[in-house]
């Protein structure tokens, strides 16, 4: 398992935390949005430009 930062681009913008976690098999621990640190809820929507702190469960690119 690896901890990483991912820059949210248009692939993930508008998707919920739950959608991204299920699709990519990872856990999102924190969202960095402008000057805010956001603790994600399952229905939190990602915005383009967010940075997410994740732990990957499987092998990812």
Describe these PLM feature segments.
Residues 1-3:
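Intrinsic-disorder/low-complexity, polar/charged segments enriched in Ser/Thr/Lys/Arg/Asp/Glu/Gln
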Residues 5-61:
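Cytosolic Rossmann-like ligand/nucleotide-binding regulatory domains
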